[in-house]
UniProtKB/Swiss-Prot annotation:
Designated gene of the protein: por1
One GO CC annotation: pore complex
Entry annotated with the keyword Ion transport: yes
Subcellular localization, as worded in the UniProt entry: Mitochondrion outer membrane
Domain notes: Consists mainly of membrane-spanning sided beta-sheets.
Species, as recorded: Schizosaccharomyces pombe (strain 972 / ATCC 24843)
Family: Belongs to the eukaryotic mitochondrial porin family.
Protein name per its UniProtKB record: Non-selective voltage-gated ion channel
Length: 282
């Protein structure tokens, strides 16, 4: 089995800290699958100011030929297209092209991604064809121990735009990582622990060496499955902001989520947020 992609080394911790917290917005998602495998996905978001944004996306996956195609259209009038090929040119090689186009402004992007997976190394390269920028990363792994690096290069300016490095350990039920990002100026240590089949815990500590405040930020989170259809999550950071969420599958294909964010340093002020998430699938 190949080591994870560089961007996914901290995935377990990041998902625990960032996903399933619908605060400050109302989220709606409707996903349906046709008999021929075509998937339709409509998603919408209304923020605290009442601004609504959304996207309609259609995708198709031809597993026999390793082909995936998707087309999306957003309420910002942006067309998003993705085409991917897997395992067609070499074992473990994945290729995809992502493009966007705005009919109103003629703004466009075109990004080519190449990814290769090997039992000992996972490599990835991304080329922004229009802006002439390159991003590359790799992860090497052995018996759960991981090491990786990332760097960006601006062809027009002829210089390295950014670089980062990560070391970690990943073996169920534990994951730990130490990352230096933003040109090795921001340091982050994180952990994830599946305590039991029902309980997950994780957190991170971050230090920005370039910041004049010289402060360390801390964030902790946990998830508890009440039953197979219901779970609750909670997190709190060093600024005293606590966030809670509750998700329940009320019936097959229908999931409801509630979120609440409290600023414990300003309990008597209007600094708190609530949110709702509705997801339908068929």
């Amino acid at each position: 089995m190949a080591p994870p992609a560089y961007a996914a080394i901290n995935k377990l911790c990041n998902d625990l800290l960032q996903r399933d917290f619908p605060v400050g917005a109302t989220l709606l998602s409707v996903r349906t699958t046709a008999p021929n495998g075509v998937v339709f996905n409509v998603s919408g978001n209304q923020d605290a100011k009442g601004v609504i944004s959304g996207k309609l996306e259609t995708s198709f996956n031809d597993k026999a030929n390793g082909l995936t195609i998707s087309q999306g259209w957003t309420t910002a009038n942006v067309l998003e297209s993705k085409v991917g090929l897997s395992e067609q040119f070499a074992p473990g090689l994945h290729l995809n092209v992502n493009t966007t186009f705005s009919p109103a402004t003629a703004a466009k992007t075109a990004i080519l991604n190449l990814e290769h997976q090997h039992p000992l190394i996972h490599t990835h390269a991304s080329v922004n064809a229009l802006e002439r920028k390159f991003l590359g990363d790799f992860t090497v792994g052995h018996e759960g121990f991981l090491a990786g690096a990332e760097f960006g290069y601006d062809v027009q300016k002829g210089n390295v735009s950014n670089y980062a490095a990560t070391i970690g350990y990943l073996a169920s039920p534990l994951s730990v990582a130490l990352q230096a990002s933003n040109n090795l100026s921001v340091f982050r240590a994180s952990y994830y622990h599946r305590v039991s089949s029902d309980v997950e815990a994780g957190g991170n500590v971050t230090w920005d060496a370039a910041s004049t405040a010289n402060a360390i930020t801390l964030e902790l989170a946990s998830k508890y499955a009440l039953d197979k259809d219901t779970f609750v999550k909670g997190k709190i950071n060093s600024a005293g902001v606590a966030t809670l969420s509750y998700f329940q599958t009320v019936r097959p294909g229908v999931t409801v989520g509630l979120g609440l964010q409290l600023d414990t340093q300003r309990l008597g002020q209007p600094a708190h947020k609530a949110g709702l998430s509705l997801a339908f699938s068929a």
